[in-house]
Amino acid sequence: IDGQIAHGDTFHDDRHPDLKADFILANPPFNISDWGGERLRDDPRWKYGVPPAGNANFAWVQHIVHHLAPAGVAGFVLANGSMSSNQSGEGEIRRNLIEADLVDCMVALPGQLFYSTQIPACLWFLARDRKNGKFRDRRGHVLFIDARKLGPLVDRTHRELTDEDIARIANTYHAWRGEKEAGEYADVPGFCKSAP
């Protein structure tokens, strides 16, 4: 893999403004309040709503969406609050993303997974083309997985997901997408739900 790593500012100096990626994986910093959002109110990346100047979470989401190719897929980690916050238009942005049929799956993770923060996290999976023929047609549905009770404590302040926990989450998502080798998907009360 060829690459170049350089210090930069993703929001204010996008080094790849025309990039359209087939796959995006990201772990952006959670809940950044000093990201200069007030200087980007009219940014073309904010197609689903202007993110609040005091929290960059939905700026990251929309930056990722902006760079997805027509059949692109993204997976990223954000603070758990991104699934429910309604402050400063965040709820409207989230609703617009769902109505645009971009949100494929949301996974609520247990707290204490990260050594750098105690903030609970979640996984977002987005897909531009949810009827692409490779998997079942998932248009109009979102898979919700509640993995908050998974993973043992490895010490007083940290939790880790086991290989079995990770496989359970992944297999649930793959089965829901219609991947034959993952088996048949079924809702499991308290763990997963496919919702229209």
What is the predicted function of each stretch?
Residues 1-2:
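Short, conserved SAM-binding/catalytic segment
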Residues 7, 12-196:
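A conserved structural/catalytic subdomain of Rossmann-like adenosyl-cofactor enzymes
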